[in-house]
Amino acid sequence: MHGRKDDAQKQPVKNQLGLNPQSHLPELQLFQAEGKIYKYDHMEKSVNSSSLVSPPQRISSTVKTHISHTYECNFVDSLFTQKEKANIGTEHYKCSERGKAFHQGLHFTIHQIIHTKETQFKCDICGKIFNKKSNLASHQRIHTGEKPYKCNECGKVFHNMSHLAQHRRIHTGEKPYKCNECGKVFNQISHLAQHQRIHTGEKPYKCNECGKVFHQISHLAQHRTIHTGEKPYECNKCGKVFSRNSYLVQHLIIHTGEKPYRCNVCGKVFHHISHLAQHQRIHTGEKPYKCNECGKVFSHKSSLVNHWRIHTGEKPYKCNECGKVFSHKSSLVNHWRIHTGEKPYKCNECGKVFSRNSYLAQHLIIHAGEKPYKCDECDKAFSQNSHLVQHHRIHTGEKPYKCDECGKVFSQNSYLAYHWRIHTGEKAYKCNECGKVFGLNSSLAHHRKIHTGEKPFKCNECGKAFSMRSSLTNHHAIHTGEKHFKCNECGKLFRDNSYLVRHQRFHAGKKSNTCN
C-alpha cells in the first residue's frame, strides 16, 4: 500500500490526473509548464485561489502557448474527479460565455483562455511579443515617443496610464506598500522590493569589473560608469554631460530655477524630492543609516557611504590630470580646480573669489568680524579653527613639520613649504605688474596689494584699513593694550612681533659682547 503511494507520488502530475500521455499532449504540457508554480490539491497546492489577484492575468505565456484551442469546456471537466466536484462548495469564478462556475482561479483561467483563443501580438520595430493588443499599443509608444497621459498637477506626461498613476502618488503622498520588517511605506511595489533587500542583505547584482555587489540593478548600471567613464546624458542648455539621467534631471532645474518640493514644517523649498526627504530628517532627527563596522548612524545614505571608506580605505575618484585619488567625489571636484584655476564662489562684500565654498565661508567671517575660536591660554580669538590650532603651537612650542634636507622644524606646514624653497631656489609666483617673483603664493597676494591699493582688513575701533591681516592684528593691540609676544630671555611682553624681534637682537648683542 505504501509502495503504491510512493510510486504515485513519483508519477508526473499528468498521470495523477488520469490523463493519457498520448491523447492529451496539450493538457500535459500545460501542467508540466505550471508544475513549478501551481500544485494540484492532492499534492499540497502551494498557491491558493485567494492569492491570485486577477486570475486571468496570472496565467503564464507558456500556458497560453500550450493550450489547444480546439478543446471545448469538457476539457476542464476532465481534469476533476467526481469527488473533487462534490467538494467544490462555493463557486467563486463564473464564465460569462457559458455560465460555467469554478471554485479555483487557475481552473477558471484555463477555461477562459479556451474561449478567448488569445492571439500573440508582435511589435514590428523590436519583435517583442504581447498577449494583448492594448499591451502592444502601450509598448509601441516607447518607439514613437508618444506620451498621451498628462498629470493635472505638474503637467508631466507619460507613455502609460500605470506610470501616471504611480507618479500621482508624489503629489498625493499616498504610499500603499508597507515593509513588514520596519514599517516603512512606499508609493511603488518595486521600491518596496528593493528596500526589503536592506533587511535580507541580498545583493544579486555583481560588477564583472571589480566584483562589487549591489541591491539594485540600477545601482550596478550607475557604478559601471566609473569604469567606463561614460557620460551619455547631455544638457541641451549648456552642453554639460552626466553619467546618470538623474544627475541631468537635477542639473536642468538649475536652468529653470524650479523648486516644487516644500517642507510642511518650515516652508523651505527644494529642487528635488530627495533633498526634501533629507531635509525633513533635521526636524524628525531620524538617522536610518547605520555603519555595521562601528555602529555610527547617519541621516543620509551618502554620508554612510562616505564614512564607510574610512574603514575600507577605498579611494575610487581619480584625477585624470595628475593621478591623485580621493575617497569623495567632492574632494576630486575641489582638487580639479587647482588644474583649471576655476574659482566659482564670490564674496558679495569685496568681490574676492574662491575655489571652494568653505573658503568663502571662512572669508565672510572677516567681514562679519566674528571670531568664535578662542585660545584657552591667552584669550586671543580667531575667525578660523585652523588659525587657532596654529596659534596654540606658540604656547606648546610644538613644531611638527620637519625639513628632510636640513632637519629644521616648523610650527606650520606653510612655513616648511616656504623654507623648502631656500634649498630648491624656486620662486614660482611672479607679479604681472612689476615682474617680481615670490616663493609663496600668499607673498605674491600680499605684494599685489601694493599695486592695487587694496586694504580689505579694517579696524572696528578706529576705521583704519590694512592690506594684511597680521598688520590689523598688530594694530588692534594698540586699542586693547594686549601684549602677546613674550621674550624668552627676560619675560618682557610686546604687542607687535617686530618689536620682539628687535628686542631679541639686544640680548644677542649682549651675548656677543660677553663672548668677546
Swiss-Prot record:
InterPro entries: Znf_C2H2_sf, Znf_C2H2_type. It is found in: Nucleus. Pfam families: zf-C2H2. Belongs to the krueppel C2H2-type zinc-finger protein family. Residues 1-20 are annotated as: Disordered. The lineage of its organism: Eukaryota, Metazoa, Chordata, Craniata, Vertebrata. GO terms for molecular function: DNA-binding transcription factor activity, RNA polymerase II-specific; RNA polymerase II cis-regulatory region sequence-specific DNA binding; zinc ion binding. One of its GO terms (cellular component) is nucleus. One of its GO terms (biological process) is regulation of transcription by RNA polymerase II. This is Zinc finger protein 83. A zinc finger (C2H2-type) spans 93-115, 121-143, 149-171, 177-199, 205-227, 233-255, 261-283, 289-311, 317-339, 345-367, 373-395, 401-423, 429-451, 457-479, 485-507. Signal peptide: none annotated. It comes from the Eukaryota. Gene3D superfamilies: Classic Zinc Finger. SMART domains: ZnF_C2H2.
